[in-house]
A protein has these predicted regions:
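RNase H-like nuclease fold core
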Residues: 3-104, 111, 115-123, 135, ...
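Generic recognition of stable, solvent-exposed alpha-helical segments in well-folded globular domains
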Residues: 8-12, 63, 115, 131, ...
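Short hydrophobic "helix-edge" motifs at membrane interfaces and signal-peptide entry regions
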Residues: 30-31, 125-126, 297-300
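Intrinsically disordered, low-complexity acidic/Q/S/K-rich activation/interaction tracts characteristic
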Residues: 93-95, 117, 133, 152, ...
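Acidic/histidine-rich catalytic cores and adjacent linkers
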Residues: 110-120, 137, 160-396
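Acidic, His- and aromatic-enriched active-site or binding-groove loops in soluble protein domains
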Residues: 126-137
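Conserved His + Asp/Glu catalytic blocks
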Residues: 140
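A polyampholytic, Gly/Pro-enriched intrinsically disordered region
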Residues: 145-165
Length: 396
């Protein structure tokens, strides 16, 4: 498209990415009454937070699949050192100048976001607040598992197996690494391992002639038998919330979501073996029934803010070590990841955005970065010194 005569450098690639990001973030959006905002904070190791507001119009919500990056626009992106309900309210209000008041705001229930959205809804009564389904499920899972002593013992067992099998020929049987952050949003991998290792143990017991490795593995994982009943409960719980999440990703939130789910999947729920999983399903579906009341007849609203979590993950990967200090101009890269990018749009972005605009945006939004401070310090010298090391080492 650009008739390049040589392969661009990595810095050129980065520059193009930031230019496209700047173009998408600062471009004019259509004023309409059907925008849905997806809001969340990213927290770095310092005190800075990044409030990101993504937007998608109701008319553009995809059918039969979850949102992709290309479906959404970045409405606003604001690094802040402190965040309160008042600050969030002002940020949403400022963003609404670009799009008109949103029809809905989807988020988790972080206290500052919750308060900010509540105040904005006083300003704009037609705006509704939708609680992210995955966060709600994680909260329900947390309430169940925190009271379950077996879960704590199972995690200890998993850690024991991980240590015993580490750096051995049996390392492939280790459990997945347990995450402390958002651990109740990510239980499925550990539960699946528990189910699989239980099956493996049963087969080892049935094996009459075992290899040395099989004897060792059977010994290490023997305690999985203690958790057989609990693993069955947890496995069914995971099956339940994955089924509901898949349904909601396809249908989104509608005024009859609860009824439609039962119409399609009541038979699956009836086949559940454990009362705990059945009760868990009722809790999630009761939440959906409550949420669907905000929808108008024949209206589809978004139910999930997971795309914003994914976008933050991409940013963290790009920032790498820099993410341990503060934000940089790389936050603009998120603008390059979203929206539909055609050759014409890319051409416009590269022609209309220069490095000066990016530097000015970074200075206004982020301020002087730690990276810039280090660069300045590196240039400071009391006197000009340029020694020829070869000359100094010569013997007269």
């Amino acid at each position: 498209m650009f008739n390049l005569k040589r392969t661009p450098s990595i810095n050129s690639g980065k520059s193009w990415m930031l230019k496209l990001g700047y173009y998408n973030i600062t471009k004019t959006q259509t004023i309409a009454d059907d925008w849905i905002y997806i809001i969340d904070h990213s927290i770095q190791m310092g005190k800075e937070k990044l409030l990101l507001i993504l937007g998608v119009r109701v008319k553009d919500l995809p059918r039969d699949r979850a949102l992709k990056y290309e479906d959404v626009e970045i409405i606003d992106l604001q690094p802040v050192k402190t965040s309160t309900g008042e600050v969030v309210y002002e940020q949403i209000k400022e963003a609404s100048k670009k799009t008109g008041n949103p029809r809905a705001i989807v988020s988790d229930m972080g206290s500052d976001i919750k308060l900010g959205v509540k105040k904005f809804r006083e300003f704009s009564p037609s705006t509704v607040h939708v609680y992210d389904l995955k966060h709600k499920i994680a909260l329900l899972v947390k309430k169940i598992l925190e009271k379950d002593d077996e879960w704590g013992e199972f995690k200890k067992f998993a850690n024991f197996v991980a240590k015993k099998l580490q750096n051995s020929t049996l390392a492939g049987y280790r459990p997945p690494k347990q995450k402390e952050k958002a651990r109740y949003m990510n239980i499925e991998d550990l539960v699946r391992w528990g189910d699989q290792i239980s099956i493996k143990y049963e087969r080892l017991q049935e094996t009459k002639v075992k290899t040395e490795d099989e004897i060792k593995l059977e010994s290490v994982i023997a305690d999985i038998a203690k958790f057989e009943q609990s693993v069955e409960i947890w496995t069914e719980m995971v099956m339940v919330f994955q089924l509901i999440e898949r349904f909601m990703n396809i249908h989104n939130l509608q005024r009859d979501s609860y009824e439609k789910f039962y119409e399609l999947h009541e038979g699956k729920l009836q086949k559940l073996k454990t009362e705990e999983a059945k009760g868990f399903a009722i809790q999630i579906l009761s939440f959906i029934k409550e949420q669907q009341e905000v929808c108008n007849q024949n209206e589809r609203l978004l139910h999930s803010s997971q795309i914003i979590e994914s976008l933050f993950g991409k940013l963290k990967f790009l920032e790498k070590e820099q993410s341990k200090s503060n934000f940089t101009s790389l936050v603009l890269s998120m603008g390059a990841m979203v929206s539909k990018s055609t050759p014409d749009i890319l051409k416009k972005a590269l022609e209309s955005v220069n490095v000066k605009k990016i530097k000015q945006w970074t200075k206004e939004k982020i301020g002087i970065t730690i990276q810039a401070q280090k660069k300045e310090l590196h240039k400071l010298k009391r006197v000009e010194q340029k020694w020829d090391s070869t000359e100094e080492l010569r013997v007269a």
